[in-house]
């Protein structure tokens, strides 16, 4: 029994700890930021009461809608608003100037509301701002020149507003800007030459304004520009500068309906050009004969005054999908060899719009299903003597017609609590669909042929992992011959509603532009993904500091209180047990009678001799089990000896079972058990020695050498194979429960091996459905930062908990960051970058050269592993398959040869450390491709 005085002490400690929590959190937030948010709310009209929870508490700890915070404990100990996410909340009113007081804000997103008034110039004070997303509102006035002060701004979207005035010269100071979207406003004046000084600018999208003057030839100096889109402006009388043929990285050049005159310059030197739209201008002369880029997919030159014939070089453009020359003054014959050339792939979609041009046609006009040909207005369409014209008259000589959609033949008005959706002719479903509004790649495919529609359905559903009957094309709208606007509806399979994880997965696919790669239908622009009806509250659950973070804070406090309680109790009982306990650790276990096959039993003396009496100079680590020593056996074999501490000692039976299990686990990517010792009350495990330490040390900023992307990919694959073995081939299956970079060790050849697994993590029997072990209820164990949130909250452990932890490991390999980084979590950092299309910015610059596509694939795989819901994470078998694909074209480093032979042959007992192979060999040519080196955030 605990004496009363100790009881009082325990209660006092716990009460003080718990009652201090609200006080602490009340003062960790800067009050002027709270006042700024309340002023923002006061200036907004919120008919749906989405911001009703902004009335009490503080933004970070009370889950204010749209507020995401991060800590700055390393700096000032406060929480700060990092993101203000108010997209599509049906808000009106004005954006208050107090928004400029949120000095730590990185993302300001008020897209697709009905906000009016001027854009606050005070936003220019937020030096940390990276994303400024104001598009889809009714802002008026001019663009504040103060926005040019935002040196860290990555993306500026002010499109779809009522902005007037000119583009400020100060925008030339946005040294970090990559995306400048000012389209669909009433901006006037000339394009400032200063915009040619933006070194990172990728997209300059200024279409649908009232811009005038000439096209600045200096824009061709932009080193990173991939899209220049200036359609529907008033550059009346201006010509296309010859310098535009020297863009270094341009992919899309779109100058539709700009009043341009003169001839088309030579664009053949733009190596990556794939999309060219110069239609609806006053261009004259002939089409240049020089061959355009092999990447060319779209050539739109319709409605000009071009003469001459179609260049023969067009027949060599094997990637061409659209050639539109409608309404010019071209002469000669219809060059049927363009679509009849055998170099074209049979499944490539191709559209040739040659209306109102030619005087004659030669060759066979029969076209395969994947080719659409328009010849209306040509003399050939008046002929009655040429076969095949009659057979395909609707497509060749008729008017272009829009494909019928589901909305043309609506479902009957049957009673349905949600919506009757027509999924195929004659079939309507009562369901709660997901509605998507987005624009397709401009401007080719507003007129769907049946073949193109089939391909489109396959493209969408395969990218979303749905079946084709789950997609309904609701409407297709022509926006002034601009980009076709598509309204889609997705219906659940076999149910009325999608479950939460499916909704989040599908929405993330659209919002992160992560569809299967295609140049035909993409890239696209997401306009709306409304979550209505049964899905209305899904996003509200993710506002503020994530619930899991708050729960971990509270749980940590409770654990701390428990520890204090136990400590106080132990202080009391320790004295009473001190004398009787002196022999506990050194009591002699009775001899283990059963021999364990495959491992050696060592005496205490042997292991003591191997470590010079467990001298501190041989200590190489410490874990939950105890200290780890490097030892050298009598036969010169180097080993790692894990010496259990008193609190880790098990019963004889438990220890024997542990050894029996570990002795049966054999895989090249698991650290091998060599033997054990149970002499004089000690319990020790003897493992193979890993001379290159753990992965965490290699990723450390203080590491003398580092791992290339090739090495990291193979480390990831190797460790994944080890974990897969534990999950599916070990008998019984084993759930690791503490996967982290410090538990992935590297041998002398830098091959990855998973360590620190054992009996305490045995998985239950396999489930009936998915071939994986079912869950087991257990006390939560693991390392903060790697801990599966579902496991933390429910205490139900599954193999998908290991998948989550491994996803964090992948993110560490990719970025070099620790899981908790400057008050935020690595998952959040990479997910944000991935959604913004800037995942390369968080990649570890020390990896050297590597393929951007491989980096993106690794990031997407890691984020998939880190999904909140276990059922949405991939099994380890899928993870291994994906990593094999990434590693397939990434050659295993050549340094695994002569240098590692030297390292692996080292057996000198006097050597306490082994030189890194990276210090002996250069690692600059291990991978193909590259990305610009950016230091990890």
Swiss-Prot record:
InterPro entries: Kinase-like_dom_sf, Leu-rich_rpt, Leu-rich_rpt_typical-subtyp, LRR_dom_sf, LRR_N_plant-typ, Prot_kinase_dom, Protein_kinase_ATP_BS, Ser-Thr/Tyr_kinase_cat_dom. Its main location: membrane. LRR repeats lie at residues 102-126, 127-150, 152-173, 174-198, 200-222, 223-249, 251-270, 271-294, 296-316, 317-341, 343-360. It is a single-pass membrane protein. Glycans are attached at residues 50, 63, 90, 114, 162, 184, 210, 272, 295, 327, 357, 370, 413, 499, 516. It is found in: Cell membrane. ATP binds at residues 620-628, 642. It catalyses: L-seryl-[protein] + ATP = O-phospho-L-seryl-[protein] + ADP + H(+); L-threonyl-[protein] + ATP = O-phospho-L-threonyl-[protein] + ADP + H(+). The active site is at residue 738. Keywords: ATP-binding, Cell membrane, Glycoprotein, Kinase, Leucine-rich repeat, Membrane, Nucleotide-binding, Receptor, Repeat, Serine/threonine-protein kinase, Signal, Transferase, Transmembrane, Transmembrane helix. SMART domains: LRR_TYP (SM00369), S_TKc (SM00220). Its EC number is 2.7.11.1. Residues 1-20 form the signal peptide. It holds the Pfam family PK_Tyr_Ser-Thr. Residues 21-547 are extracellular. One of its GO terms (molecular function) is ATP binding. Residues 614-886 form the Protein kinase domain. It comes from the Eukaryota. Residues 569-937 are cytoplasmic. One of its GO terms (cellular component) is plasma membrane. It is an enzyme of class 2 (transferase). Belongs to the protein kinase superfamily. Ser/Thr protein kinase family. This is Putative leucine-rich repeat receptor-like serine/threonine-protein kinase At3g53590.
């Amino acid at each position: 029994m605990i004496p009363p005085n100790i009881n009082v002490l325990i209660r006092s400690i716990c009460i003080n700890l718990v009652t201090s929590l609200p006080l602490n959190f009340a003062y960790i937030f800067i009050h002027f930021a709270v006042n700024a948010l309340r002023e923002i709310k006061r200036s907004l009209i919120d008919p749906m009461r989405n911001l009703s929870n902004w009335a009490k508490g503080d933004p970070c700890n009370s889950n204010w809608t749209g507020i995401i915070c991060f800590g700055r404990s390393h700096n000032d100990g406060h929480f700060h608003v990092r993101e203000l996410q108010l997209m599509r909340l049906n808000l009106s009113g004005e954006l208050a100037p107090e928004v400029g007081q949120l000095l730590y804000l990185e993302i300001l997103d008020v897209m697709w509301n009905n906000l009016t008034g001027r854009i606050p110039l005070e936003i220019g004070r937020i030096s940390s701002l990276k994303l400024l997303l104001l598009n889809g509102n009714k802002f008026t006035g001019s663009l504040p020149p103060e926005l040019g002060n935002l040196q860290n701004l990555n993306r500026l979207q002010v499109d779809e507003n009522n902005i007037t005035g000119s583009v400020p010269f100060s925008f030339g100071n946005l040294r970090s800007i990559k995306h400048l979207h000012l389209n669909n406003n009433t901006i006037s004046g000339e394009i400032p030459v200063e915009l040619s000084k933006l070194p990172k600018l990728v997209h300059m999208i200024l279409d649908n304004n009232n811009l005038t003057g000439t096209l600045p030839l200096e824009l061709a100096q932009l080193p990173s520009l991939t899209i220049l889109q200036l359609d529907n402006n008033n550059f009346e009388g201006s010509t296309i500068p010859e310098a535009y043929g020297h863009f270094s990285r341009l992919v899309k050049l779109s100058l539709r309906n700009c009043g341009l005159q003169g001839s088309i310059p030579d664009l053949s030197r733009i190596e990556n050009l794939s999309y060219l739209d110069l239609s609806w201008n006053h261009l004259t002369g002939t089409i240049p004969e020089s061959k355009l880029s092999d990447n060319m997919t779209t050539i739109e030159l319709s409605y000009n005054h071009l003469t001459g014939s179609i260049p023969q070089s067009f027949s060599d453009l094997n990637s061409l999908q659209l050639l539109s020359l409608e309404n010019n003054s071209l002469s000669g014959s219809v060059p049927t060899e363009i679509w009849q050339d055998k170099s074209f792939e049979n499944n490539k979609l191709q559209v040739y719009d040659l209306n109102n041009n030619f005087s004659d046609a030669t060759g066979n006009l029969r076209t395969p299903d994947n080719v659409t040909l328009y010849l209306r207005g040509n003399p050939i369409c008046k002929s009655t003597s040429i076969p095949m014209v009659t057979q395909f008259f609707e497509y060749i000589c008729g008017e272009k017609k829009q494909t019928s959609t589901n909305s043309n033949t609506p479902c009957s008005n049957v009673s349905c609590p949600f919506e009757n959706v027509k999924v195929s002719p004659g079939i309507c479903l009562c369901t709660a669909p997901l509605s998507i509004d987005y624009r397709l790649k401009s401007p080719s495919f507003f007129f769907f042929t049946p073949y193109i529609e089939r391909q489109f359905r396959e493209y969408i559903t395969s990218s979303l992992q749905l079946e084709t009957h789950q997609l309904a094309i609701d409407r297709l709208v022509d926006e002034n011959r601009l980009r076709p606007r598509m309204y889609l509806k997705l219906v659940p399979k076999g149910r009325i509603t999608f479950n939460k994880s499916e909704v989040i997965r599908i929405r993330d696919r659209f919002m992160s532009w992560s569809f299967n790669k295609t140049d035909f239908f993409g890239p696209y622009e997401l306009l709306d993904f409304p979550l209505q009806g049964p899905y209305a509250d899904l996003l509200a659950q993710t506002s503020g500091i994530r619930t899991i973070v708050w729960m971990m804070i509270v749980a940590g406090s409770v654990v701390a209180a428990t520890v204090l309680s136990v400590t106080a109790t132990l202080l009391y009982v320790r004295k009473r047990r001190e004398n009787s306990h002196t022999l506990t650790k050194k009591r002699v276990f009775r001899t283990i009678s059963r021999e364990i096959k495959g491992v050696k039993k060592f005496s205490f003396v042997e292991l003591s001799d191997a470590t010079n009496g467990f001298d501190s100079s041989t200590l190489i680590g410490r874990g939950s089990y105890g200290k780890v020593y490097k030892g050298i056996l009598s036969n010169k074999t180097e080993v790692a000896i894990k010496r259990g501490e008193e609190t880790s000692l098990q019963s004889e039976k438990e220890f024997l079972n542990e050894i029996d299990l570990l002795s049966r686990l054999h895989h090249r990517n698991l650290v091998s058990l060599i033997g054990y010792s149970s002499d004089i009350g000690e319990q020790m495990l003897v493992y193979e020695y890993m001379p290159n330490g753990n992965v965490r040390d290699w990723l450390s900023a203080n590491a003398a050498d580092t791992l290339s992307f090739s090495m990291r990919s193979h480390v990831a694959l190797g460790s994944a194979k080890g974990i897969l073995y534990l999950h599916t081939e070990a008998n019984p299956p084993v759930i690791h429960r503490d996967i982290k970079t410090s538990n992935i060790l590297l041998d002398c050849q830098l091959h990855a091996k998973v360590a620190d697994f054992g009996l305490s993590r045995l998985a239950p029997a396999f489930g009936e459905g998915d071939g994986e072990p079912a869950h087991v209820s257990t006390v939560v164990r693991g390392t903060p930062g790697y801990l599966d949130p579902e496991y933390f909250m429910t205490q139900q452990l599954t193999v998908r908990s290991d998948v989550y932890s491994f996803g964090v490991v992948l993110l560490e390999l990719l970025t070099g960051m620790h899981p908790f980084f400057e008050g935020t979590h690595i998952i959040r950092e990479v997910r944000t970058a991935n959604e913004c299309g800037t995942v390369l910015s968080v990649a570890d610059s020390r990896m050297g050269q590597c393929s951007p596509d491989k980096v993106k694939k690794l990031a997407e795989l890691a984020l998939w592993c880190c999904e909140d819901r276990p059922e949405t994470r991939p099994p380890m078998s899928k993870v291994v398959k994906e990593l094999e694909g990434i590693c397939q074209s990434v050659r295993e480093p050549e340094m695994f040869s002569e240098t590692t032979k030297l390292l692996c042959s080292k057996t000198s007992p006097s050597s306490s450390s082994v030189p890194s192979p990276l210090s002996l060999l250069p690692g600059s040519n291990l991978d193909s491709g590259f990305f610009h080196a950016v230091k990890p955030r």
